[in-house]
Amino acid sequence: MSNPSPQAPEEEASTSVCRPQSSMASVSRRHRRERRFRRYLSAGRLVRAQALLQRHPGLDVDAGQPPPLHRACARHDAPALCLLLRLGADPAHQDRHGDTALHAAARQGPNAYTDFFLPLLSRCPSAMGIKNKDGETPGQILGWGPPWDSAEEEEDEEVSKEREWRQKLQGELEDEWQEVIGRFEDDASRETQEPESFSAWSERLAREHAQKQRRQQLEAEGSRRPPRAEGSSHSWRQQEEEQRLFRERARVKEKELCESRARRAQEAQGDRGPAPPRARPRAEHPRGAGRGSLWRFGDVPWPCPGGGDPEAMAAALVARGPPLEEQGALKRYLRVQQVRWHPDRFLQRFRNQIETWELGRVMGAVTALSQALNRHAEALK
């Protein structure tokens, strides 16, 4: 009768010991390859880095402290940033300080806005709302300030009602704008139709705002005290004058756009040579028919014609508002202008209307104008 072999438990024990050792060796190899991948990026050997990731697709392109995207922004290495985004790097990945790649790009100043900040923002817009351990968002580092729909400040009853109405109006306008865009996208014949122009949209917005303000003024006339009636009428006249100037500037800008489109069409016709005799075409092309419908820097409806110094544009906007003696009315007027020229709002609303190669210059001017308006508002506190 043969006894059971005592080597069986020993073999099982050796197998169980080898398994974690093999797993640890695999993890160690992966970490070495990830370090090699980061060294290739730092040395500018992008082809080697891409080939290494193709041979070992399981590597984590966001591994390391700081992560590779943060290093590329800090070194102003635009090719490495483009390669990392193409390989699937996450712009929302945070380092040990809670910073995302957008935080790192924002700290590099205005020179890094076009090559680093805009590509990261286009890949992951939601990262704009991520705060680091200091409670800062990328927009706050750039000096944009918090969006007005997230500001938490104690105000009196009248200002609170106006802010609530402004947020409601903004939401309705955004919903209506999205609905208009969706209708034109679903319509097969949209090339033969003209969507609502910028001047018509601005006039409609000003008209609805004036009607709303007039209704609120009529409802509140019975409850307001006589000494405040004169100040209210004066503030109302200031608002009407500001709206009239805004509509006039929008009409002038629309006229300039039409002349610019006609001039570009004539230049294009001259490059193609004389055309056979036929009926003269319309000078204004349908929207979306060519690049002539997109804005350049001078086509943007700046507060001053052609743009210029941000401080001068901010001073022009303040000069159109109520006098300095009416602090409350002037603060409300400045809040309206800050919302209108906030970089996030401007980029969301007009990004598709601006030439791509002019986008960085336009957004730089809008950011500077927004910061100048913020300084004027801070001076009134």
Swiss-Prot record:
Basic and acidic residues bias: start-end ranges: 204-228, 257-270
Comp. bias regions, Acidic residues: 150-159
Instruction: Output the Gene Ontology cellular-component terms.
Output: nucleoplasm; nucleus
Q: Write out the ranges of the repeats annotated as ANK.
A: 64-93, 97-133
Q: Which UniProt keywords apply?
A: ANK repeat, Nucleus, Phosphoprotein, Repeat
UniProt subcellular location: Nucleus
Where are residues bearing Phosphoserine located in the sequence? S150
- Feature: compositional bias, Polar residues: 14-26
The source's superkingdom equals Eukaryota
Gene3D superfamilies (alphabetical):
Ankyrin repeat-containing domain (1.25.40.20)
Location of the region described as Disordered in the Swiss-Prot/TrEMBL record: 1-32, 129-166, 186-242, 257-294
Q: Does the keyword Nucleus apply?
A: yes
Concerning PROSITE patterns, the annotation shows:
ANK_REP_REGION (PS50297)
Q: Which protein are we looking at?
A: NF-kappa-B inhibitor-like protein 1
Any single GO BP term: negative regulation of canonical NF-kappaB signal transduction
Q: How does it assemble?
A: Interacts with CACTIN (via N-terminal domain); the interaction occurs in a pro-inflammatory-independent manner.
Q: What does this protein do?
A: Involved in the regulation of innate immune response. Acts as negative regulator of Toll-like receptor and interferon-regulatory factor (IRF) signaling pathways. Contributes to the negative regulation of transcriptional activation of NF-kappa-B target genes in response to endogenous pro-inflammatory stimuli.
Organism source for this protein?
Rattus norvegicus (Rat)
* InterPro entries for this protein: Ankyrin_rpt-contain_sf, NFKBIL1
UniProt GO molecular function: transcription regulator inhibitor activity
